[in-house]
Amino acid sequence: MAADDREDPAPHPAAARIVVDPSDREATVAALVAPGAWLREGKLVAFPTETVYGLGANALDAAAVERVFAVKGRPAFNPLIVHVESAERATAVARALSPLALRLAERFWPGPLTMVLPRRREVPDVVTGGLDTVGVRVPSHPVARLLIAAAGVPLAAPSANPFTQVSPTTAQHVFDQLGDRIDAVVDGGPTTVGIESTVVAVESGPDRGERLVLLRHGGVSRAQLEQAGFVVVEPAADEDEGAARRSPGRVERHYAPGVPLVGVGRRSDGKLELPAPQAPPPFAVLARGDGAGAEQAAACEVLPIDVEGFTRGLYAALHRIAASGCAVAYVERLPRDPAWRAVADRLRRAGLAD
């Protein structure tokens, strides 16, 4: 079914909010009984993972998954990632894991890594975009894993935001964007990684050997994969818009805050190199380490200088910039270093222009 053919669900009463403390396992298990039941019944429940908040639906319930697409305005060709409780449970949606996939799971699961694997026929086409593969992940966030256990079913869960907009890293982001269109939000506090999972296709055979095809940069870097002994290759280029994709997050326009983003550098005195028009419109700044030179900015977001800290805070900063009413946001250019590849990809797809 094409995205344009899906019924756009009308707003309904605000989603239920279930607040949990990830450090209190017993109380969290009790609090997740109800949302687990709602997921089995075909309802939509947003929940925290270590990467971003996901919009969960029973991955084996085609009608529930179709509602995810409708709520997000997501095109049908864009496959979803299925979240399972453990590597052993991956075979609920994927055929037997190859030795290469098992080694990868042992090293990086639970964690922010998605494997694209041959699907089982029980997985509805709507989950996979009609492909014969399915993306599978075991999240490391304790609330996510307890919710999957409470539901008793694998959860198809894209980011809990309208398609192409900034992903949510807090429960409030979800309420602001989808709160009147879904059934519940499990509030487990802010996420810790801050961007989506890395996606790899696991390939092995006499013609290709054993290798990982890196389809999306994310919470696990290429360097980490290679340091663990895996052979990693990348596609030459993204596939054409609208074509079937093996990975989500590869649409050219994505993660966008609705404000033009313009890259800027630093002057020799360390201040941001901002334009100085005669009558500047309200502008925002997104900088690393300090906001020197941005004294006239209507909104100034200063993130840590290290890649982990910057990544963790990026989407929250973009949400604040989107809400600031500024006409443009000047973004400090990132280091040209492989460690920054994932966050640079997000900013490029968000519309960052140099």
Language-model regions, residue ranges each:
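Active-site-adjacent structural elements in enzyme catalytic cores
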Residues: 2-354
